From Swiss-Prot:
Species this protein is from: Chlamydia felis (strain Fe/C-56) (Chlamydophila felis)
Function summary: Binds directly to 23S rRNA. The L1 stalk is quite mobile in the ribosome, and is involved in E site tRNA release.
Protein name: Large ribosomal subunit protein uL1
Transmembrane intervals: none
GO CC terms in record: large ribosomal subunit
Family: Belongs to the universal ribosomal protein uL1 family.
Domain of life: Bacteria
Keyword field contains Thylakoid: no
Length: 232
């Protein structure tokens, strides 16, 4: 049997596919799975009881994970003049205005998150077909369209992430690294759940957190009991 096959078999023995676990149990299972040679990202996939086709049931926002993401972000800032200088001084990786717009039009997207000052959005808006599908478009709801670029950069460095329900009503997000202490991962996930619950549209009826799965990059998807998450 190959090393890969042994790893998969070991994972399959570690939990019951048909069962929903508490959040702590799910994290413990992931951390007990055979390791790989890199620090895996822990992801969550949350099916929401919304109709994303309706404008009053679309969900998008941001949340600051209390323990960060463990990821070093490449931050781009669309700004000019004094705001561009502030962004550079605050540690942004890429700062520019029309020059960056043209570069991105040419296909360059080698960054993880974009921030823009309001006066830049007229030009940045033209990049919708490039940035939109990659969830890189700055938005006021996510706090990435702002005059306070210094604050935005600091929050992103500390672990602020954006969440958004896709066309199927599913929200996917990275919530830390598998090397994190289990309690730190739990706190990050609870912070995301709290933000999602606060963002529940008034028009959404019935069960809101329909299903919840936590996984690692190379690990299994573990089903989590949504009743615990709604109560936390």
């Amino acid at each position: 049997m190959t090393k890969h096959g042994k790893r998969i078999r070991s994972i399959l023995k570690s939990y019951d596919f048909s069962k929903s676990y508490s959040l702590q149990e799910a994290i413990d299972i992931l951390k007990q799975c055979p390791t790989v040679r890199f620090d895996q990202t822990v992801d969550v996939s949350i099916k929401l009881g919304i109709d994303p086709k309706k404008s009053d049931q679309q969900i998008r926002g941001s949340v600051s994970l209390p323990n960060g993401t463990g990821k070093t972000l490449r931050i781009l800032v669309f700004a000019a003049g004094e705001k561009a200088k502030e962004a550079l001084d605050a540690g942004a990786d890429f700062v520019g205005s029309d020059d960056l717009v043209e570069k991105i039009k040419g296909g360059w997207v080698d960054f993880d998150v974009a921030v823009a000052t309001p006066d830049m959005m007229r030009e940045v808006g033209k990049l919708g077909k490039v940035l939109g599908p990659r969830n890189l478009m700055p938005t006021p709801k996510a706090g990435t369209v702002t005059t306070d670029v210094v604050k935005a950069i600091a929050e992103l460095r500390k672990g602020k992430i954006e969440f958004k329900a896709d066309r199927a009503g599913v929200c996917n997000a990275g919530v830390g690294k598998l090397s994190f202490d289990g309690q730190l991962l739990k706190e990050n996930i609870e912070a995301l759940c709290s933000a999602l619950i606060k963002a529940k549209p008034p028009a959404a009826k019935g069960q809101y957190l329909v299903s919840f799965t936590v996984s690692s990059t190379m690990g299994p998807g573990i089903s989590v009991d949504t009743r615990e998450l709604m109560a936390s």
